[in-house]
Curated annotation (Swiss-Prot):
GO molecular function, one term: cytochrome-c oxidase activity
Protein's UniProt name: Cytochrome c oxidase subunit 2
Reaction catalysed by this enzyme: 4 Fe(II)-[cytochrome c] + O2 + 8 H(+)(in) = 4 Fe(III)-[cytochrome c] + 2 H2O + 4 H(+)(out)
Lineage top rank: taxon: Eukaryota
Annotated residues for binding of Mg(2+): E198
Cofactor dependence: Cu cation
Enzyme Commission number, as recorded: 7.1.1.9
Oligomer and partners: Component of the cytochrome c oxidase (complex IV, CIV), a multisubunit enzyme composed of 14 subunits. The complex is composed of a catalytic core of 3 subunits MT-CO1, MT-CO2 and MT-CO3, encoded in the mitochondrial DNA, and 11 supernumerary subunits COX4I, COX5A, COX5B, COX6A, COX6B, COX6C, COX7A, COX7B, COX7C, COX8 and NDUFA4, which are encoded in the nuclear genome.
Primary localization: mitochondrion
Gene Ontology CC annotations of this record: mitochondrial inner membrane; respiratory chain complex IV
Family statement drawn from the similarity comment of this UniProt entry: Belongs to the cytochrome c oxidase subunit 2 family.
Example of a GO biological process term: ATP synthesis coupled electron transport
Protein's job: Component of the cytochrome c oxidase, the last enzyme in the mitochondrial electron transport chain which drives oxidative phosphorylation. The respiratory chain contains 3 multisubunit complexes succinate dehydrogenase (complex II, CII), ubiquinol-cytochrome c oxidoreductase (cytochrome b-c1 complex, complex III, CIII) and cytochrome c oxidase (complex IV, CIV), that cooperate to transfer electrons derived from NADH and succinate to molecular oxygen, creating an electrochemical gradient over the inner membrane that drives transmembrane transport and the ATP synthase.
Length: 227
């Protein structure tokens, strides 16, 4: 989860988020090298008094600044494509959940179970218990099993919303009349928080998302008690 004054990403909870963190570090390293080279050239130009009279027609230099950016773009594009394909790949999900955005709450329907559906509203500040997080707690959490592929279908009943859980690397737009899908696999149990990430009206800030990831046997007990 996030902490006060945190500058980095949340700890990765899924393979997708781990890939995103690796890609971020890879891209940041390339940006750092480019920035260092540009700053070095600027300092060199500001401090040196030497003049190259043939600078206007140097084919070697033109080849370098054409080929080098192409190589850099390839180094960025290849891992980017790998991560994108990994995020879109859905192989035999063992559970499918339909998530609907409303103004201003979420509703969840476990399509593999009969009559297992509920709405999820934010708990107001005056109703919080000791240790609960302000603007992040809900009355009904989305409970999922760990270490199993889960498909989440996302749509909206009214306006644009966005279902996002940063520690799992998830952010999917909820669009009225359209069904988007995303897959998630949690590597450890716990509580994971998210929020609506698309401005959707006056109470946009009051649409938290809470995922409770538990071992499979506890999930089966929970689903049996509600179904």
């Amino acid at each position: 989860m996030a902490y006060p004054l945190q500058l980095g990403f949340q700890d990765a909870t899924s393979p997708v988020m781990e890939e995103l963190l690796h890609f971020h570090d890879h891209t940041l390293m390339i940006i750092f090298l480019i920035s260092s080279l540009v700053l070095y050239i600027i300092m060199l130009m500001l401090t040196t008094k030497l003049v190259h009279t043939n600078m206007m027609n140097v084919q070697e230099m033109e080849m370098i600044w054409t080929i080098l950016p192409a190589i850099i773009l390839i180094l960025i594009a290849l891992p980017s494509l790998h991560t994108l394909y990994m995020m879109d790949e859905i192989n035999n999900p063992l559970l499918t959940i339909k998530t609907m955005g409303h103004q201003w709450f979420w509703s969840y329907e476990y399509t593999d179970y009969e009559d297992l559906a509920f709405d999820s509203y934010m708990i107001t500040t005056d109703s919080l218990k000791f240790g609960e997080l302000r603007l992040l707690e809900v009355d009904n959490r989305m409970v999922l099993p760990t270490d199993l592929p889960v498909r989440v279908l996302v749509s909206s009943e009214d306006v644009l919303h966005s279902w996002a859980v940063p520690s799992l690397g998830l952010k999917t737009d909820a669009i009225p009349g359209r069904l988007n899908q995303v897959t998630l696999t949690s590597m450890r149990p716990g509580l994971f928080y998210g929020q609506c990430s698309e401005i959707c009206g006056a109470n946009h800030s009051f649409m938290p998302i809470v995922l409770e990831l538990v071992p499979l046997k506890y999930f089966e007990s929970w689903s049996a008690s509600l179904a």
